[in-house]
Each structure stands twice: as C-alpha cells, then as structure tokens.
C-alpha cells in the first residue's frame, strides 16, 4: 500500500512537471476487477439467457458460445466483436435446436448483449486505489481514457463502468473490437 502511494505521487509529480494532457488506463484488472472467472461469467450469462429463450437446455447455448470463440481463434481472428460472436451462436442454435427456437436474430443479439452487460455490472468491483489516482489526475486537468481488449464495444464498456459511479471521470473509451485492433498487436 505504501509503495502504491509513493508510486501515485511520482505519477502525479511527473504529470505536473511534463504537462501531461492524457492518461490511459486498462479497464479490466486495472480499474475494475471481475469477482468471478470468465467461465463462470458465461455460465451465468447462459442461465439468464435461458430464462428468456425457448431453449430446453442451456448446454447447447454454452457449447455454441465456446465453439464459436474457439473457431474464431483457430482462424486467427482475435479482432471480433460481440455481434459477430452472437450472430454465429444464433446460427448454431438454429442448426442444433428444434423449430421451437424462433427468436429473431437481431433480438437475440440485443438480449445477449443486455445480459452480458448486466452480469459484468453485477460481478465487477472497482479498484479503489486506481480510481483515487484517476480523481487526482482529473484534478490536475489530465484527461482520462480507458483502453481495453474486449469484445463488447465502447458503448458496452461505458455501461459497465457507468454502473460504478466512481468511474464518471472518463473522457474517452477505446475498445479493440471497435477498431479491429488489439493492444497486444500495438495497433490500439
């Protein structure tokens, strides 16, 4: 804790001395932390989706989602967005389910995104120390941007961050799927 305070003072001092205009932060594991694993998140998403869908089992839904992501990765496609994932999941569900699955694709994607955002809001907590640093940077008139490799675009990230009132200081949100780029590639 003491080290982090010293580090934050050094960051603030550096920003003052060098007239820094922008500070960039990662979203997950920096500003907010998930309290469950990604696999648990998908399980919870599946359960919430099942409540709204005419699907007899959630297993096909979970398998369809994991299969789609695995196929994207096998094809070296790491720059996908949520709509692409859910469009492919929908197509798989149509293929494997009985005719009782009759939800419109657009509505399915909207519902899936809504549930995904809700679960992320429910199972994320803020990093108080980094948010305190945001406040101090903001007080220095440093603009704050979030950069994230996430399959939900900036609108979704803003909703997740917006559920945490302390994160209202953000000036800009950059999400990899909106730009078809990744931080890991140095493109974002």
Which residues does each PLM region occupy?
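Asp-based, Mg2+/Mn2+-dependent phosphohydrolase catalytic module
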Residues: 1-19, 151, 157-188
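Active-site neighborhood of HAD-like aspartate-dependent phosphohydrolases
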Residues: 10-65
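Flexible loop/turn segments at secondary-structure boundaries
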Residues: 31-33, 39, 124-126, 152-155, ...
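Hydrophobic (often cysteine-bearing) scaffold residues that line and stabilize catalytic clefts
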Residues: 38, 42, 82, 130
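Short, surface-exposed alpha-helical segments at coil->helix boundaries
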Residues: 43, 83, 87, 154-158, ...
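A metal-dependent, Asp-based hydrolase signature
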Residues: 45-115
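Substrate-recognition element of Asp-dependent hydrolases with the DxDx(T/V) motif
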Residues: 107-162, 173-174
